[in-house]
């Protein structure tokens, strides 16, 4: 629950404590509920984030190359950027990789959002046709449900539409593909 608590703190600092206006916070809360995080812990994390004395965590993206020229993106949450740069550089060096400059590999990746929804009573083709209007790029089914992939910017619109249709969201998140 610690990781989800930190995600809640960062989401509140970035977009405010109201999940109705902060889609990122809404997604993190939903993911917390999916792993049975108690409601008290969620509320405590939101309250802690509203406290001005709380350390300010920032998301920082590091780019580099692993052995054989494999592009690597490392997303971190830190309150001390200098320490984090040193740690990430150390890991790259230990693995015979190299830390790149800003923009050296990020262009190779698409920042996407994804949703896993309950497939009961839903047709994959119908969902795909309906959610293309909200930004969905790829929709497919597997044994755990229906997966929807879309650009990062479409997260709020798709989540709001799924909630308005009362479709159960099993999980949601962000990926770089």
Which residue stretches match the model-derived regions?
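Translation machinery proteins
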Residues: 19-76
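Strongly charged, low-complexity linkers/loops
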Residues: 125-130, 142, 149, 153-177
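Short amphipathic alpha-helix segments
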Residues: 43-50, 83-92, 117-134, 154-162
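Intrinsically disordered, Lys/Arg-rich N-terminal extensions and targeting peptides
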Residues: 1-20
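Flexible hinge/switch segments at interdomain interfaces of large molecular machines
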Residues: 1, 19-22, 59-67, 99-109, ...
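Short glycine-/aliphatic-rich beta-strand segments at the starts of folded cytosolic domains
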Residues: 106-119, 146
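RNA pseudouridine synthases
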Residues: 63-77, 84-110
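A common structural junction motif
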Residues: 92-99, 133-138, 162-171
């Amino acid at each position: 629950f610690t990781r989800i608590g930190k995600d809640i703190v960062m989401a509140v600092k970035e977009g405010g404590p109201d999940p109705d206006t902060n889609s990122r916070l809404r997604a993190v809360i939903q993911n917390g509920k999916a792993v049975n995080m108690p409601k008290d812990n969620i509320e405590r994390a939101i309250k802690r984030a509203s406290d001005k004395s709380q350390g300010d965590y920032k998301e920082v993206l590091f780019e580099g190359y692993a052995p054989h020229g494999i592009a690597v993106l490392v997303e971190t949450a830190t309150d001390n950027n200098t320490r984090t740069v040193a740690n990430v550089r150390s890991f790259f060096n230990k693995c015979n990789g190299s830390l790149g400059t800003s923009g050296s590999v990020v262009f190779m990746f698409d920042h996407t959002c994804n949703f896993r929804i309950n497939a009961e009573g839903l047709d994959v083709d119908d969902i795909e046709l309906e959610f293309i209007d909200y930004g969905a790029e790829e929709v497919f089914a597997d044994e755990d449900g229906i997966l929807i992939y879309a650009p990062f910017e479409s997260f709020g619109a798709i989540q709001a539409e799924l909630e308005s249709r009362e479709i159960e969201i099993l999980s949601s998140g962000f990926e770089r593909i």
